[in-house]
Amino acid sequence: MDVKLLEATDDPEDLICKAARNDYSDTSVGSQSFEATMAEVDGDSLEEKKETLIGHLLDHGHFGPFEHAQATFAVEGVSRSCMAQITRHRHVSFDVQSMRYVSFDDVDPEAVREGELVVTPPSATDPDWIGRNQQKASVSDEEFEERAEIFKDTIEQAVESYQELLELGMPPEDARFVLPIGTKVNIVMSMNARMLMHVADMRAAADAQWEIREMTEEMLELAADWCPKTFEYYEQEMKGRKNRLAP
């Protein structure tokens, strides 16, 4: 998996603050300087004022201003299972690598056993891995080796069958039906800062599946560089709380 910040609103926290101050200003924020807009906010410098205002907004549940700052992420190599989970979220725009127009006829099926094309879950590589809804708390070495081999055999066979169907003239849009839900996909997705916090509330939580949790954590790391005061406050004061931010 690889996650990159593809594009994002410049000076996002200036924009958040301008939008928030607009609600309480008798002068349009479009006709005055940022310094004038922030004049009544506590702080000795503009950076302190931004920190004060952003903390106040998040602490009091005034999330609307955070919808003005937008970020676009490029995600490479997550499973179709992870894609199905993240695309359930509203107010996020997606473009997804197509399996109708992109075929995988040149992939070596044996390489699939080692992570090519199909995501390998930790439970197929780590005998001590404990996952949600697992039927057995622990497994023997023999059981682990057997399940790891079954997993690798199955995905290798699926890719071989897919490629055979292509060779027999089946269109990629139909041949893809035999590929596993772990097949890797690339995604471009855009969301505002408020929505990213909501996604993190749901998908960085301990009860989220390991893959989408890892993806979300990487997005949060990138967001911390892009929108630092907002996501520092989120990490310290909001992340993991029971009252999750509504979409």
From Swiss-Prot:
Cofactor note as given: Binds 4 FAD per tetramer. Each FAD binding site is formed by three monomers.
Amino-acid positions noted as binding dUMP in the UniProt annotation, renumbered to this chain: 85-88, 98-100, 176, 203
Record motif ThyX motif, residues: 88-98
Pathway membership, UniProt: Pyrimidine metabolism; dTTP biosynthesis
InterPro entries, per the entry: Thymidylate_synthase_ThyX, Thymidylate_synthase_ThyX_sf
Keyword set, alphabetical order: FAD, Flavoprotein, Methyltransferase, NADP, Nucleotide biosynthesis, Transferase
Residues of the ThyX domain: 1-237
Reaction equations catalysed: dUMP + (6R)-5,10-methylene-5,6,7,8-tetrahydrofolate + NADPH + H(+) = dTMP + (6S)-5,6,7,8-tetrahydrofolate + NADP(+)
Active site: 203 (involved in ionization of n3 of dump, leading to its activation)
Record flagged with keyword ATP-binding: no
Binding residues annotated for FAD, in chain numbering: 88-90, 192-194, 198
Cofactor needs: FAD
A GO term for molecular function: NADPH binding
Top class in the EC scheme: transferase
E.C. code: 2.1.1.148
GO terms of biological process kind: dTMP biosynthetic process; dTTP biosynthetic process; methylation
Taxonomic superkingdom: Archaea
Function recorded in the entry: Catalyzes the reductive methylation of 2'-deoxyuridine-5'-monophosphate (dUMP) to 2'-deoxythymidine-5'-monophosphate (dTMP) while utilizing 5,10-methylenetetrahydrofolate (mTHF) as the methyl donor, and NADPH and FADH(2) as the reductant.
Assembly and oligomerization: Homotetramer.
Family to which this protein belongs: Belongs to the thymidylate synthase ThyX family.
Protein name: Flavin-dependent thymidylate synthase
Organism: Haloarcula marismortui (strain ATCC 43049 / DSM 3752 / JCM 8966 / VKM B-1809) (Halobacterium marismortui)
